[in-house]
Amino acid sequence: MSRRCELTGKGPMTGNNVSHANNKTKRRFLPNLNDVTLQSETLGRGVKLRISAAALRSVDHRGGLDAFLAKAKDEELSAAALKVKKEIAKAQAAEA
């Protein structure tokens, strides 16, 4: 599993630990990833994703997984999230 958010594309960053004496050593800043099951209202089922805590807040803010994926750019999404986005779009087109 890569350390990358499936919805926002957030990944590890590099930087320095800086001591009181201003000694610098390399370190990695890892994203706060969580395995979650988000409910899709259109599909009527849960979708398992590995997303960052910030992405989870963004999903809640936008009104759920369906609304988040509708506005999300395809370049930022993982292959699994892109597949779910297309399934949702297909289901919404069939309903209308």
Curated annotation (Swiss-Prot):
GO cellular component: cytosolic large ribosomal subunit
Signal sequence region: none
SUPFAM superfamilies: L28p-like
Keywords associated with the record: Ribonucleoprotein, Ribosomal protein
A GO BP entry: translation
Region (Disordered): 1-22
Molecular function (Gene Ontology), one example: structural constituent of ribosome
A UniProt-annotated Pfam family: Ribosomal_L28
NCBIfam families per record: L28 (TIGR00009)
Family according to the record: Belongs to the bacterial ribosomal protein bL28 family.
The protein's name: Large ribosomal subunit protein bL28
Organism: Ruegeria sp. (strain TM1040) (Silicibacter sp.)
Annotated gene: rpmB
